[in-house]
């Protein structure tokens, strides 16, 4: 059950070694990953396509804003576009990986290429190999293909659509503009990738990357920066990284991918809006200005609320897991940072672990399962809850009161 939930939630955590699974088992996991990766977005598209009597206008607008950055929204067309992009990207990834694995003399290069292509694009982190991708730590070609698949799966279909339309506009008279959403996603994605890669290279040079030649240190620094935010593949064991690096990795996992994507976490755009408001926002208007565009108070409030609630849920998960594994924490089998890392990885549907997943007791496994499920569906559910709460508040007026804060 643990592996099934992990696959559907596109997390990648597993309590069992991957070499115990048969070909049939891997096919089932692969289908669960594909279903889990596209399931929510497909469900949302059908949800919005329902008659207005079954879905309120407010909820319809909310889900549009949350998943699709499109002015003229047509659910069936968007769904068709999502499935088309997914098929094309995964097919190209499959062909490229098949060539790479063939040259690497992998006996099962066809099936492994298909499995890893789907897992990478869906940001699942599952691999048919026992030690994830550690066998390809020095293979620039294979890791580069996987990194591109992870990024494409993590930026969101709205961004891919916007960029494709922009490229098409160069060949037609119709002009297409890059949306503010796309600009924020690209900015945050590049910032997190570059920052993480530079940090890993400098501070893990003589630690996790100590035995690697210089080219592989650069390659694995970049790969670690990309995979740790949501994908969960690893070329090196996570318990080899120094504690300061692990803490930074936890922050990156919590941020995750971008809104409207297959990735987990609170999302890059959410963090960007909250950060912009904290340091450059109009407190009275409760809004922020970016690229000469005003981002509404509703989006600002939603961002802050999602981060706050996610942090509370994650803290509860960490506390419960610590209680469940109190004996192992006391005798030194687990460390506090192991528990925090495991819960954050589950909540952000990353799938990386410091080697404790297989040693968790029954209660701890249930906690991780619930954390994965909440992390996969929770942000969307929280957005709906926030919207409903605001609607109920708008119908009643209460006296205002002042409270000192800070």
Model-identified regions with their sequence ranges:
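Membrane-proximal intracellular helices of multi-pass ion channels
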Residues: 2-406
């Amino acid at each position: 059950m643990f592996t099934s939930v992990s696959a559907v939630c596109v997390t990648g955590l597993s309590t069992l070694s991957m070499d115990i699974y048969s070909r049939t088992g891997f096919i089932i996991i692969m289908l669960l990953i594909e279903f889990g990766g596209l399931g929510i977005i497909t469900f949302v598209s059908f949800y919005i396509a329902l008659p207005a009597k079954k879905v309120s206008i407010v909820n319809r607008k909310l889900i549009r804003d949350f998943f699709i950055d499109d002015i003229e929204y047509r659910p069936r067309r968007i769904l068709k576009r999502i499935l088309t992009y997914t098929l094309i990207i995964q097919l190209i990834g499959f062909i490229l990986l098949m060539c790479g694995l063939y040259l690497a003399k992998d006996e099962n290069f066809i099936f492994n290429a298909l499995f890893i292509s789907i897992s990478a694009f869906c940001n699942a982190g599952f691999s048919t190999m026992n030690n994830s991708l550690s066998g390809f730590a020095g293979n620039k070609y294979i890791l580069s293909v996987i990194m591109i698949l992870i990024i494409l799966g993590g930026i969101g279909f709205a961004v891919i659509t916007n960029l494709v339309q922009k490229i098409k506009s160069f060949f037609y008279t119709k002009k297409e503009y890059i949306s503010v959403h796309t600009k924020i996603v690209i900015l945050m994605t590049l910032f997190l990738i570059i920052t993480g890669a530079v940090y890993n290279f400098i501070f893990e040079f003589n630690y996790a990357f100590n035995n690697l030649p210089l080219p592989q240190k650069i390659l694995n620094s970049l790969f670690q920066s990309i995979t740790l935010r949501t994908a969960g593949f690893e070329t090196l064991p996570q318990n080899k990284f120094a504690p300061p690096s692990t803490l930074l990795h936890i922050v990156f996992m919590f941020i995750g991918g971008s809104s409207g994507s297959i990735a987990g976490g609170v999302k890059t755009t959410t963090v960007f809006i909250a950060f912009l408001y904290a340091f450059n926002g109009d407190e009275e208007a409760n809004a922020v200005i970016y690229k000469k565009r005003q981002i509404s108070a509703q989006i600002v409030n939603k961002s802050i609320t999602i981060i706050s609630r996610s942090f509370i849920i994650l803290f509860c998960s960490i506390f419960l897991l610590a209680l469940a594994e109190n004996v192992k924490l006391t005798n030194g089998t687990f460390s506090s940072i192991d528990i925090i890392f495991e819960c954050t990885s589950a909540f952000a549907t990353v799938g990386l672990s410091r080697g404790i997943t297989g040693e968790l007791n029954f209660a701890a496994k249930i906690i991780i399962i619930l954390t994965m499920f909440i992390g996969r569906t929770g942000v969307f559910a929280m957005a709906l809850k926030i919207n409903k709460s605001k609607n109920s508040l708008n119908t009643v007026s209460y006296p205002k009161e002042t409270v000192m804060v800070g």
